[in-house]
Amino acid sequence: MKKFLLAGLIAAGAGSVMAEEAPATADTVQTNLNIVWTLIAGILVFTMQAGFALVETGFTRAKNAANIMMKNIMDFAVGSLGFYILGAALMFGASKAAGWLGWGGLGMPSLSGGEGFWDWTFFFFQTMFAATAATIVSGAVAERIEFKSYLIYSILVSAIVYPISGHWMWGSLAGEGSQGWIEALGFHDFAGSTVVHSVGGWIALAGAIALGPRIGKYRHDGKANPIPGHSLVLGTLGVLLLWIGWFGFNPGSYTAGIGSIGRVAMTTNLAACAGTIAALVTAWVVMGKPDLTMALNGSLAGLVAITASCDQVTCNAAVVIGLVAGVLVVLSVFFFDKIHIDDPVGAVSVHCVNGVWGTLAVGLFAAPASLGYGNDLVGLFYGGGFKYLGVQLVGVGMTAVWAFGMGFAIFMTLKKAGILRVSAKTELKGLDVTEHGQDAYASFQFFSNM
């Protein structure tokens, strides 16, 4: 009897609570859906940190594996705090100086008149992007940069360099009063081919130049010595993780649970597949062998290239963008080797070169409203003329000047201070033991002539 009485009281209480609650409106349901989807997308983007760590570790030597892992986890940790304390305000605060700078006070600026669920969700998602821009550089400076210098770089990029250029192109994501000067021209970069990847790629180029090549990379006759990574298995797993993460990176950039996310996921995947195949074929022709590392970088190149236009192009255009990216990444790797810029993982070729290509591709392939796309500007190949391409070129050019210039200034300052590059003895022995007193593979013995 007591059990039935208790059940009745619970049912009555639940009924009264339900009676007091107002029914959810369509707007409330959509807002909650947007929050859930954006959080899921942000978590997917976070998995890209693991992808980058595995790619960089696999493409470099075993004696530096722990150092690579340490750099990747620490650039996320210090970068997230730097973006929270200062970067978010610079990127999404109210526009100052005609859209050249944002400011909303230290800490996370408010988007809704006070801290709310959407504010937290939005800035969680954007923090993942800031961390991605910072970690791109790790591979290009691998096996020779001092750990403390890398920490300094990570803080400066996440707190200052990335947010300032990000405001120019994405400031209005926080509201109309935050519009940057480049986006006011009509510039379009949906998920960050330039805002994220080119920024990281240009800084990676600056770092590789400032550091110089690894010991033994180039012979006296100018030809490059191959320095193979120790695990193509780790590298492949890393690329697959990045590929998965990109389904949060691109579709998640709507920050809304709407039907268009399916189209963006489709164009993203097609470009990645096309990039993989194009890089494989190009490397096969040039090198005489179907090279796995080139195919893997082709996947990433296709993903980077489609990131700017994934919401504005057709599936056929996505394939073309990916094919071009796959060819470019292979030719770019050989080009940088030819001019003695040592990039152990091909970060500059993947993120800088194809970030530029992907951003310009918006001005070529942006589809018109007649095909179901609500674009204000139409690409050159659809009769839109050169205006859109010109606007995209402005964004690419200004980002190159800012990111490369600031990156080079940071790395050269560290070099002048004598803390940028490890000693030759440390480099030859490996950074795991010398920098961290640890060995990533303590139970294994590796044989190497370098």
List each model region and its residues.
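N-terminal secretory/membrane targeting signals
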Residues: 1-20
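Glycine- and aromatic-enriched membrane alpha-helices
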Residues: 19-450
